[in-house]
Structure formats: structure tokens, C-alpha cells
Amino acid sequence: MLAKRIVPCLDVKEGKVVKGVQFRNHEIVGDIVPLAARYAEEGADELVFYDITASAHDRVIDKSWVSRVAERIDIPFCVAGGIKTIAQAREKLAFGADKISINSPALTDPSLIERLQDEFGRQCIVIGIDSYFDAQSNSYKVKQFTGDEAATKDTQWFTQDWVQEVQKRGCGEIVLNVMNQDGVRQGYDLKQLSIVREICDVPLIASGGAGTMAHFKDVFEIARVDAALAASVFHKGIIDIGELKNYLFENSIAIRR
């Protein structure tokens, strides 16, 4: 059995790491490179960096901090934010990122997934999906440009349909960002993740809702995801990554230690 991964997420806005609740009301939590170094030292398996306003503001990730992170840490990391061309992706990989993630640009132009996969291989192409539960239709739907409240909009896609579409086009991993759960620390959306797991043939990363160590155990055991992403519990020191890994190991979860 492949080891499960613990993935701290660093949302970046105006050069700082920030964290909000349900993608809103972001507060500054620290500087990019020191936080990345701290999580690497604590035992994170990889890191994800989201420049949360890049797509909404029609710009791309600042490559300067990408190179500084690469110089400082020795674990894989993924970057996302406004990447919509082969050249932009190549630049981020050249500056040290191991993977690139696309979200809103893929919704605008789904063929981007195929072009990136053809150029770099599917192993480094991650698709982020911002999914929310729509009570009116009793279904999960996908939103776009979620890093800026004024720019956020609904899309035509139901989450399950978009999951199948991005796999068909060649993505290597999927991060399912459950907007309703984001930052509230009440647990991952096990129901939605379990539904997606049934139709997802690539590694699936859960995002949104971690508040206790038991939440990580549950998402691995019940939803059978490959990795669990979290932010506020790590930023605020609620959970130590090393202690979390020991807890998971003691509960028979295959984990790198």
C-alpha cells in the first residue's frame, strides 16, 4: 500500500501567507519561506502554494518566491495561480516547483490540461477543483475565481462531471477543495470525497475541514483519499505534523515517518 501524504497548504496573497474561512476574510499568518521551511522540518510530505488572487486578477505567480522556496526545502512542492500557458508552467518548473496546479484557467480552457500533459507529463499536472454544496439543487457544483469574492462565479459544471472531464484530458492528481468546509475545522466532507473517490482513478487529495487528528484518520479510512491537505490547523499550531504522523501510524494508517 502506498503511504498516505500530509500536505500543508499555503495560500499566498500579496507576498504573504494568508488564511480565510470558506475562502473569505483572509488574515495574514506568516511569511512564505519560513513557513515552508518549518513544515518541511516538521515532516510534511509535500507543500502546495496557491496564489489565490492571480487568476481573478489576470496575473501569474511571482517566480521570485518559488525559487526561494526551492532553495530552502528538500521536499516536493506544487504551485498554482494564474498559469494558463506552456511557457508560464515551464518557468515555474524551471524555478524549482515539482508540480503545477491549475484551477480556474482549466475551467476557461479545458484543452490547457491536455497541452500541459503533452509537454510535461501527467505526473506533474494537478487540477484543483473548488466544489460547493448547492442546497437548492441538492448537488455539488464547481466555482471559479474563488480567490477574490468580487470575481467568484458559478460554472456550468457539476463536480462529478468535472472530475471525470479533467481525468479524460490527462491530469495526474486532483485536489478537491470543499468550500463549505474550508477553515471551519469540523472535518472533511467524507460524503462528497467518497463519491468522488468512486469515479477518480488518479490520486485524490482532500482539502477543507481538518480540525483534529481524527479528521485525518477518517478521511484516509472512510474516503480512501491518497493525501490530506490542511492549512489553519498547521498555521495556528493546533496540530503538529510529526505528532499527527505518529497518531496515524498508531491507528494503522500507512504513512511516511
From Swiss-Prot:
Pathway: Amino-acid biosynthesis; L-histidine biosynthesis; L-histidine from 5-phospho-alpha-D-ribose 1-diphosphate: step 5/9. PANTHER family: IMIDAZOLE GLYCEROL PHOSPHATE SYNTHASE HISHF, IMIDAZOLE GLYCEROL PHOSPHATE SYNTHASE SUBUNIT HISF/H IGP SYNTHASE SUBUNIT HISF/H. IGPS catalyzes the conversion of PRFAR and glutamine to IGP, AICAR and glutamate. The HisF subunit catalyzes the cyclization activity that produces IGP and AICAR from PRFAR using the ammonia provided by the HisH subunit. This is Imidazole glycerol phosphate synthase subunit HisF. It catalyses: 5-[(5-phospho-1-deoxy-D-ribulos-1-ylimino)methylamino]-1-(5-phospho-beta-D-ribosyl)imidazole-4-carboxamide + L-glutamine = D-erythro-1-(imidazol-4-yl)glycerol 3-phosphate + 5-amino-1-(5-phospho-beta-D-ribosyl)imidazole-4-carboxamide + L-glutamate + H(+). HAMAP family: HisF. It is found in: Cytoplasm. One of its GO terms (biological process) is L-histidine biosynthetic process. Belongs to the HisA/HisF family. Heterodimer of HisH and HisF. InterPro entries: Aldolase_TIM (IPR013785), His_biosynth (IPR006062), HisF (IPR004651), IGPS_HisA/HisF (IPR050064), RibuloseP-bd_barrel (IPR011060). It comes from the Bacteria. Keywords: Amino-acid biosynthesis, Cytoplasm, Histidine biosynthesis, Lyase. It is an enzyme of class 4 (lyase). The gene is hisF. Its EC number is 4.3.2.10. One of its GO terms (molecular function) is imidazoleglycerol-phosphate synthase activity. The active site is at 11, 130. Its main location: cytoplasm.
